[in-house]
Amino acid sequence: MVMTDPIADMLTRIRNANLVRHEKLELPASMLKKEIADILKREGFIRDYEFIEDNKQGVIRIFLKYGPSNERVITGLKRISKPGLRVYAKSTELPRVLGGLGIALVSTSKGVLTDKEARQQQVGGEVLAYVW
C-alpha cells in the first residue's frame, strides 16, 4: 500500500502510542521525519530518538516522554498542511500555538524549524503541524 502522507502517519503513530502510554515506537525513516524527531527532542516533547539502519530505508525509533506521575508531555498533535491542501505562511504570519506553549513545525528553505526559529531567521514556509 502506498502511503500518501508520511508526516500524518508519523504524527498518528506518536499520538496513538502516547495515548496508550507506550515507552517507544518505530516508524519508517526519512530525512524529513528525522528532522521532525530532532525538533521534538530539542523542544522536550520526546525523550530521545535513534536511527536504525537496515537494508531498506531504515527505521526511526522514538522514545516517548512522560511526567513524574506518568502524565503525557505531548497533549496534542495536529497536521496542518496536507497533500490536498498545502498551507504556507510568511515569517510575519507564522501562527503561535496556544500562545507560545506549543510549537508549529515549519518546513523552510533552511530545513524544518519551529515557528519561533523561523520568525527569528525571518523565513517562511509550509506549516507542517502543531504540537502542544
Swiss-Prot record:
Single GO term (MF): structural constituent of ribosome
GO biological process, one term: translation
Pfam families in the record: Ribosomal_S8
InterPro entries: Ribosomal_uS8 (IPR000630), Ribosomal_uS8_CS (IPR047863), Ribosomal_uS8_sf (IPR035987)
Gene3D superfamilies: 3.30.1370.30, 3.30.1490.10
Keyword Oxidoreductase: no
Keywords: Ribonucleoprotein, Ribosomal protein, RNA-binding, rRNA-binding
Any one GO cellular component localisation term in the record: ribosome
Domain of life: Bacteria
Role noted for this protein: One of the primary rRNA binding proteins, it binds directly to 16S rRNA central domain where it helps coordinate assembly of the platform of the 30S subunit.
Alphabetical list of NCBIfam families matching this protein: PRK00136.1
Subunit structure: Part of the 30S ribosomal subunit. Contacts proteins S5 and S12.
Family: Belongs to the universal ribosomal protein uS8 family.
PANTHER family per the UniProt record, alphabetical: 40S RIBOSOMAL PROTEIN S15A
Identification of the protein by name: Small ribosomal subunit protein uS8
Organism: Shouchella clausii (strain KSM-K16)
